[in-house]
Amino acid sequence: MNSSGIYRKVREVIDVDSRYYLVGGDYPCSNPSLLVCPWSQDILSQLDVAHRSLFPAVLTTQLALDRKGVTFLKPRTSGNSSSYVQSAMEEAHSEEWARQTIRYLSDCERHKKMATFIPSAAVYLPPPTFRPLPLAQWFETVHSNDILSHLDEMKGVITSTYGRILKMDSTKKITKKLAGGIGDSAAWISNIGNEFGQVLNSVLTSGEGAGLEELCQGVVTRYKNAGQAEPEAIYVDRDCCSQSGVSSVAKLFHPWQSAVRLDSFHFMRRFNCGLTTEHHPLYGIFCAKLSSCIFAWDQEDVQRLKEAKRAEWKSSHSGHTPTEEQLMATISPGELKRHCRRRTRGVEEIRGMISGLLESVWELTDTTGLRLVSHDSMRHVWEVQQKHLECLQDPAGVALYTKVGTLQKGGKELDILRCGRGSSSLERTPTVGYSCVFTLQ
């Protein structure tokens, strides 16, 4: 290829507050019928990363957007959208156009005063009119083109995500957010995530349970190819055990020998079938009591939190020591969850406590006389769910809590903990760093 001047076409680029033109060199090939565009993807892909990063814009069919403008499309903050970026940049363009117009008219006026003694009158052209920016949809196209240019890197990041504790869950909540032509193409989404809330793999299907074998074996293959150790535990919302001894989930993740456990949230939700209504005034109290029947707080963590809160109380109450009741009243449920670990009680302890709870609420009613518990339904629910008490137990030797930071409270340093137990977090749309590959089946 030899240079023969400037390429016959130029590209208009929209900057943050102005426009400029992209000019390239003309490098004809030895074949005269073969035209080579200097900014084609085939040419740019041959450059090394350092030189490719110098290319200033993201191209579309007609126009291009400077990379400084593309940066504004990337933040996932609340309220940021292509419409917001389009309106903000158009405002910046209009202000710059107004400044340039005022400068041009001022120069014309000054030139007119200086040309008073020239016989022929000077002719001044009107300033150029303001050119609106493209619609917000064009900015979305630019953002899509920018993402596609990093597709290989994004795939590499997504498929390099692993975890010690995996969670598998199927839900309809996310598929209800699908719009457009694919709005009714899927009814369920099944996700596999790790203890950090990252999604390893997803599949969109027309029914619950479909495509799970390919989903799970894909994760197994990923671990095998990367030389990663198999997860220590897998939390699921169903099929945690089997009368034959090998659960369906264990078969899906064959040949892994990871412990399969039932998510406690889904276990407690099954008791709703034994209640008259979820809108009963005593429903919240019942759920809180049921949770306390399954879990017990780590007393060492609770004691450290109480010492920190006691010191905090003394500093704000002139050194007075609070009573136990006053101290416990200052500890919120959020603080317990943030700084204290929980463990599952033993099988027989859970069985006895839930049985006692059901006996205590058996005849409870609201002010209208509506019972909280439907007797026949609850008897059947409890009879069936007792076989899953073993599936609720914490896996032996598995650290379910991760320290993510520290916090100073009352002069004491407290750990901020993240729990890896449970799968219900996969039922909602993640808000930070959600990256996954969707497969339609």
Name what the model sees in each region:
Residues 234-331:
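Conserved beta-strand -> loop -> alpha-helix junction used to position metal-binding or nucleic-acid-contacting
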Residues 41-44, 178-182, 203-206, 216-218, ...:
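Short coil/turn segments at secondary-structure boundaries
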Residues 108-233, 240:
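RNase H-like nuclease fold core
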Residues 1-46:
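Short, conserved DNA-binding cores of transcription-related domains
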